[in-house]
Swiss-Prot record:
Belongs to the conotoxin T superfamily. The cysteine framework is V (CC-CC). Expressed by the venom duct. It comes from Conus caracteristicus (Characteristic cone). GO terms for molecular function: toxin activity. This is Conotoxin Ca5.1. Residues 1-19 form the signal peptide. Coiled coil: none annotated.
Length: 71
């Protein structure tokens, strides 16, 4: 007799709730937007920008001797 309420509660927890149509549409829009963002390509010059910024910082604070050209 005690197992019946537990079984009903577990069944209710496991069953998917009826989703709101607006919520379902928002979720599908977010998934589509995420897939479109995943397809975008990075600018090939981004690596050059990162390296030049790192070298400028290295030269400014003189962390390493070999990163700057001695004049």
């Amino acid at each position: 007799m005690r197992c019946v309420p537990v079984f009903i509660i577990l069944l209710l927890l496991a069953s998917p709730a009826a989703s709101d149509p607006l919520e379902k549409r928002i979720q599908s829009d977010l998934i589509r937007a995420a897939l479109e963002d995943a397809d975008t390509k990075n600018d090939p010059r981004i690596l050059e920008d990162i390296v030049s910024t790192a070298l400028a910082t290295c030269c400014k604070f003189q962390f390493l001797n070999f990163c700057c050209n001695e004049k």
